[in-house]
Amino acid sequence: MTPDSSPSSVDDPLFESGHRIFANKDLLKIGHVPEADRIVGRDEEISKLAKRLNGAVHGYSPENVMIYGKTGTGKSLVSKHVCQRAQNAAQDGVEIGTAYIDCAEDNTETQAISSLAAKLNNESSTGISVPHTGLSTSKYYKLLWKTLDAQFDSVIIILDEIDLMNDDSVLMKLSRAEEAGKIDCSVGVIAISNKIQYVDNVNERVKSSFQHKELFFKPYDANQLREIMFNREDFSSSTTTYSISWPGWTASSCSRARFKAATF
C-alpha cells in the first residue's frame, strides 16, 4: 500500500491520542531519583545518612546503616539520592561504586550477590564476565570481590526490603569482606525495612558483625504531602487542566491540585 492510498487515521477512544496528561512521566516513576530541591521533609534524614557515609567520599569505610519506616516515607529515595551525591562528591580520585538491590525480587543470597556483581561490574573495564545464572553462591562472591577491587575504593550497597531476604548472612559477609581479607576496597551497607523489629530477629553473629547505626523515617504530614505534589507540578505544561482531590485537603489549604495536559 502506498502512502497515497493508505486510509486516513480515525480517532479511537480505545487508544491514546497524541495529547497526554503528563509531560514528563519520569517524575512519577517509583525508581526516579529527583533533584535535592524536590525531596520534601527529609533534610534531617539526608544529613544523618550522609554523615554515616562520609568516609566513602574520602576513601575510608562508610558506616553500615539500618533504615526503618512505613511504606512511602522516602527511605529508598533518600538512600539513592545520598549515594548519588556521595559519588559526585568523591575527592582526590576516590572511586565510589553504588548498587541498589530490591530484596523482594532478589530474595536469596545467590540472587542478591549475582545481581550485585552484575550491576557493579563494567566488563569492558574489568574483563570479568558475570553470568546471570549457573554459578554457586561462593563463586558469585568471588566474582563480586574481584569486580569491586578492580574498580572501586569504596562501595555503598542498598538492600531494600531486607526483611524479605531469606538469609540474613549476606549482611555479615558484605560488611566483613574487607576485615576478612576478601577485598581491599571498603563496603558500607544500607539495609531498609518496613519492620522496626527486623534486627531483633537477626542472627546474633550477623548483628554483631553488621554493627549498624539506625535511622527512622516518620510518615509525611499533610503539609509535606501537599508540597510533594506541587514540587512535581512541572511534569505538565500549560494546556488543558484537570483537577483532583487530595484526602485531608480543605479549600483554605489549596484543596485542589491542577495537572495540565501536554504533548510529548
Swiss-Prot record:
Reported consequences of knocking out the gene: Essential for normal growth.
A GO biological-process term: DNA replication
Q: Which InterPro entries match?
A: AAA+_ATPase, AAA_22, ORC1/CDC6, Orc1/Cdc6_arc, P-loop_NTPase
Q: Which residues bind ATP?
A: 73-77, 220, 232
Under the heading SMART domains, the entry gives:
AAA
Q: What is an example of a GO molecular function annotated in this UniProt entry?
A: ATP hydrolysis activity
One short Pfam family name for this protein? AAA_22
- Give UniProt keywords alphabetically: ATP-binding, DNA replication, Nucleotide-binding, Plasmid
Keyword ATP-binding found: yes
Q: Which family does it belong to?
A: Belongs to the CDC6/cdc18 family.
Q: Which PANTHER family match?
A: CELL DIVISION CONTROL PROTEIN 6-RELATED (PTHR10763), ORC1-TYPE DNA REPLICATION PROTEIN (PTHR10763:SF22)
Q: What does this protein do?
A: Involved in regulation of DNA replication.
Name of the protein described by the UniProt record: ORC1-type DNA replication protein 2
| Organism encoding this protein | Halobacterium salinarum (strain ATCC 700922 / JCM 11081 / NRC-1)
* Gene giving rise to this polypeptide: orc2
